[in-house]
């Protein structure tokens, strides 16, 4: 039999929801997993179900492009976004991430190197490519100095 502490239950503050993050094809950085992969079922505004994992971006950099209109012409502004100790919910929407991350389980506390390698395509396939390695393995092969 369980005894529930209703006072503590009403005072309990669950961890706040983190902003979703889908790394771009030029993202390079190291993340630390704060938990394991979990499944989020499709809701009204979502295209499909998605697998996610809460992470802390220890260090990373990504190019951001912003399109705007100036004097009737469309222009693009490019800037570098740097990440440091930011907590996000990593979406495993990209097939390479969805395939690679479970092979690194258990994830909690694990540091993972991610680097976008651009779009890959061939006769019968098209996908976004990423390098996904444990931080220690990335150091061994010289991807991190």
Name each model feature, range by range.
Residues 36, 74-75, 91-98:
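A short, sequence-level motif marking secondary-structure junctions
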Residues 95-114:
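Short nucleic-acid-contacting surface segments enriched for D/E, G, S/T with interspersed K/R
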Residues 29-35, 109-117:
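OB-fold and OB-like beta-barrel modules that bind single-stranded nucleic acids
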Residues 1-82:
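OB-fold ssDNA-binding interfaces and closely related basic DNA-contact patches used
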